[in-house]
A protein has these predicted regions:
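Basic, flexible Lys/Arg- and Gly-enriched helix-loop patches that mediate nucleic-acid binding at interfaces
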Residues: 1-208
Length: 208
């Protein structure tokens, strides 16, 4: 096995975590650390949230292919028909923090349904309903201002699979469209559908 040196000292400690300013050599060659990358995408319909798809379907990675040379991965997921904000990074610690249930990252969705939503059902979602995988309740829910009663804004911190769709399906509605408009304080402002941008330093600090 080749010798690993950190800051010119042979590394014998297992599990040592390399720090951003460490200089690492392997077999005499200096290793270049990847720069941290944080990319925000406004995902369109029809793309799968995965790093590769064996069936050859379009993935979100196709949309951010030119964003960075770093090996970024999506933080969480949006299903194929869902649109809106999806974050990518190579910062494993931040990705873990943002997806861990205890962190309680706020996500806001704009939901369009196949029929008018009753006020009683809004109240039930706010109070809590029980799905196959346990209880769930919205942090906030209301009709979208100036829109029809088929359009609802719902805020959740749950990361459970298809949770928004399942909430409304449980109450007899069909979700016509689902758009994530806020994720962990990040919004879609000045970010058209299908486009991406790099996070600012202050946005990264806010997430950490």
């Amino acid at each position: 096995l080749g010798a690993v040196k950190v800051n010119n000292k042979i590394m014998t400690e297992l599990g040592y975590r390399v720090k951003p300013n460490d200089v690492v050599h392997f077999d005499g060659q200096k290793l270049q650390a990847e720069k941290p990358a944080y990319v925000l995408l406004n995902k369109p319909k029809g793309f799968i949230t995965t790093t590769r798809d064996e069936k050859g379907r379009r993935t979100v990675m196709d949309l951010v292919a030119n964003a960075t040379t770093s090996r970024i991965v999506p933080v969480g997921r949006l299903d194929r028909p869902t649109t809106g904000l999806l974050l990518f990074t190579n910062d494993g610690d931040l990705a873990k923090k943002l997806t861990h249930p205890s962190t309680g990252v706020k996500k806001l969705y704009h939901v369009v349904l196949d029929k008018t939503v009753s006020g009683q059902h809004l109240q039930r979602i706010k109070s809590g309903i029980t799905l196959d995988d346990g209880a769930i309740k919205a942090d906030e829910i209301s009709f979208v201002q100036g829109a029809s009663k088929r359009e609802v804004g719902i805020a959740l911190h749950s990361g459970r699979n298809r949770i928004v769709r399942r909430i409304f399906e449980h109450l007899g509605y069909e979700v016509v469209s689902l758009d994530r408009v806020l994720f962990a304080g990040l919004t879609k402002k000045d970010l058209p559908r299908g486009h991406w941008r790099h996070l600012s330093q202050s946005e990264v600090q806010q997430l950490k």
